[in-house]
């Protein structure tokens, strides 16, 4: 029999319903795996007692035929989802001992559906990073290793802990957040399905903010069906979030295995020309195009003329919003406070923020404050907002001709820890292919579609029209079926 922690979420639900095993056994299998692989540093807070209590309730519900959708399924949550009575830090020293007195809407939705939480996962500080190396708890190690090379690799960021937990069989699914690619890029680096829904599909209430017009909850799973199951539980209107969409949650599971015949898939190959895209990634892109052609889709060459400015636009808008959002961390009401005798209020603010924020967060606050200053507002911030509209228009125009768009999730395979650490610009380019869809608020997924020459996973990104998660999952499911001969599983796990 397959080890319980290696079952997909859908197979775990099936096994629990058939009483092949109990939720307590399933949770214990995951706890053992977490303890076995502590060195990956995927979890920053473990809630095993809570998970085992939840598993006992789940077992009772199964015995009484009262099981909910996710009854007894062990999941992990990125440490920026506020969890009532459980430490929530955003992996920053400024919030290192913060315990919220309320629950985020997304975690509450999962609890309401019967999910049990194993713990909170490591992440880049305040979700600012692409390699999970800016956390105050230290970096996360990718469970994957390249062929004939034992070097530690990054899991991607900012949701690196969530990605490592699912890839390393330490959770059935894990919540992440995606602002500019923080679910899709780590999913590509760790061989997972990483889904970011339409902006506003999942409530942002109770999520520690980075850039409010871009932040969206997402999910990591080991199959496309698992993503559909989790999304149905996570999504829905929430009056506590002013950007939440009043849209009915579709029956996403029926998309799995549905025919894509006669669907039109847009391919902006020109976006890959002259970029930092690696040959292995380009080959995967071409192979996926052939796979979809063979499945009966029509491949349409499209252009997204303004998408190439996405990274520049993002690194004006996101830091601007971050500088505003992070101004609340001042040591007055909660979080870290640095004090000494005869200190003025201004000195307390200054010393608290200097001690509490890491280098990357400080860099982005400074950039954001600069672009919002009266002398730079027109030249940078307002111009970036105009180009953001042009990027969104590019997608609107493309979607008059096609149903979905196909792009790599990342320009490279996972790289070594420390490799790009000293050059922020090179690090920012990791999000080259994910940022455009974020700027337009579109639903998108990274699905494992191939291995590099060094045996590392590569993810293909499918982007859909607003609120069209269904077709995104349909195409992702077709790609998943087409590469089922490849084992997307790290060695030694």
UniProtKB/Swiss-Prot annotation:
Keywords: ATP-binding, Ligase, Nucleotide-binding, Protein biosynthesis. InterPro entries: Amidase (IPR000120), Amidase_CS (IPR020556), Amidase_dom (IPR023631), AS_sf (IPR036928), GatA (IPR004412). It holds the Pfam family Amidase. The active site is at residues 78, 158, 182. One of its GO terms (cellular component) is glutamyl-tRNA(Gln) amidotransferase complex. It comes from the Bacteria. GO terms for molecular function: ATP binding; glutaminyl-tRNA synthase (glutamine-hydrolyzing) activity. It catalyses: L-glutamyl-tRNA(Gln) + L-glutamine + ATP + H2O = L-glutaminyl-tRNA(Gln) + L-glutamate + ADP + phosphate + H(+). Its EC number is 6.3.5.7. The keyword Ligase applies. GO terms for biological process: translation. The keyword Electron transport does not apply. HAMAP family: GatA. Allows the formation of correctly charged Gln-tRNA(Gln) through the transamidation of misacylated Glu-tRNA(Gln) in organisms which lack glutaminyl-tRNA synthetase. The reaction takes place in the presence of glutamine and ATP through an activated gamma-phospho-Glu-tRNA(Gln). Heterotrimer of A, B and C subunits. Belongs to the amidase family. GatA subfamily. This is Glutamyl-tRNA(Gln) amidotransferase subunit A. It comes from Rickettsia canadensis (strain McKiel).
């Amino acid at each position: 029999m397959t080890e319980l922690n290696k079952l997909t979420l859908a197979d775990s639900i099936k096994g629990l319903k058939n009483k092949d095993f109990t939720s307590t056994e399933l949770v214990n299998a995951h706890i053992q795996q977490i303890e076995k692989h502590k060195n990956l540093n995927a979890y920053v807070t473990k809630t095993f007692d809570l998970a085992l209590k939840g598993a006992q309730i789940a077992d009772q519900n199964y015995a009484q035929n009262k099981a909910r959708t996710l009854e007894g399924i062990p999941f992990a949550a990125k440490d920026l989802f506020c969890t009532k009575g459980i430490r929530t830090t955003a992996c920053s020293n400024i919030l290192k001992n913060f315990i919220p007195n309320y629950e985020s809407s997304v975690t509450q939705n999962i609890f309401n559906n019967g999910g049990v939480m194993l713990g909170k996962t490591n992440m880049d500080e305040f979700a600012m990073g692409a390699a999970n190396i800016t956390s105050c708890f230290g970096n996360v190690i990718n469970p994957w290793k390249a062929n004939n090379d034992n070097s530690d690799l990054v899991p991607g960021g900012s949701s690196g802990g969530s990605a490592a937990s699912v890839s390393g069989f330490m959770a059935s699914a894990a919540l992440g957040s995606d602002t500019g690619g923080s679910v899709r890029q780590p999913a590509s680096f760790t061989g997972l399905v990483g889904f970011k829904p339409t902006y506003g599909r999942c409530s942002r209430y109770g999520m520690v903010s980075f850039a409010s017009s871009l932040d969206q909850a997402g999910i990591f799973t080991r199959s496309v069906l698992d993503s559909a199951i989790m999304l149905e539980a996570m999504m829905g209107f929430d009056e506590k979030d002013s950007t939440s969409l009043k849209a009915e949650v579709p029956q996403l599971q029926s998309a799995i295995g549905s025919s894509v015949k006669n669907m039109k898939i847009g391919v902006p190959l020109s976006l890959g020309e002259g970029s930092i895209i690696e040959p292995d990634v380009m080959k995967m892109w071409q192979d996926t195009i052939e796979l979809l052609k063979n499945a009966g889709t029509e491949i349409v060459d499209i252009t997204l003329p303004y998408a190439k400015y996405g990274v520049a636009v993002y690194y004006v808008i996101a830091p601007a919003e971050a500088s505003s959002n992070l101004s609340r961390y001042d040591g007055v009401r909660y979080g870290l406070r640095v004090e000494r005798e005869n200190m003025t209020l201004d000195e307390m603010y200054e010393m608290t923020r200097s001690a509490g924020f890491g280098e990357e967060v400080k860099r982005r606050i400074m950039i954001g404050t600069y672009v919002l200053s009266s002398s730079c507002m027109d030249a940078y911030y307002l111009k970036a907002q105009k180009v953001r509209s042009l990027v969104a228009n590019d997608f609107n125009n493309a979607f008059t001709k096609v149903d979905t768009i196909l792009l790599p999730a990342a320009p490279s395979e996972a790289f070594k820890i420390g490799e790009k650490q000293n050059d922020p610009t090179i690090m920012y380019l990791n999000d080259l292919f994910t940022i455009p869809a974020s700027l337009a608020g579109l639903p998108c997924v990274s699905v494992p579609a191939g291995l590099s020459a060094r045996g590392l996973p590569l993810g293909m990104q499918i982007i859909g029209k607003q609120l069209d998660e269904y077709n995104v999952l349909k195409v992702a499911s077709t790609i998943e079926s087409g590469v089922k001969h490849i084992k997307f599983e790290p060695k030694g796990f």
